[in-house]
């Protein structure tokens, strides 16, 4: 029977929503204040859940040191105190929109790739604040 473990990581980052091919007026109509040219920031909370069998010797489903190293490299180092649109190439103009949904999916892909066969990531939740959380769960 699988067990689950969730590790939380936080980061502060700025972003805005904008589609380069659209006029400023259309971006403002669709994205509202989130399309403002000077960006805006959040104190993000990201919960990454992994699953696996409990090791009969260690009692763990994953080595927390390894998981923490991956989260530091793939999440905190990439996003903390960054402008997501400008500093994370995948989210630049014409790339991914820096929504909570896209951040959750992107973080899932990066963390799962880094962990490889060690464990399976089953859920990534990204909260911009206490009232809004986006969740990605792979099929």
Where does each model-flagged region fall?
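Charge-rich, low-complexity N-terminal segments
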Residues: 1-139
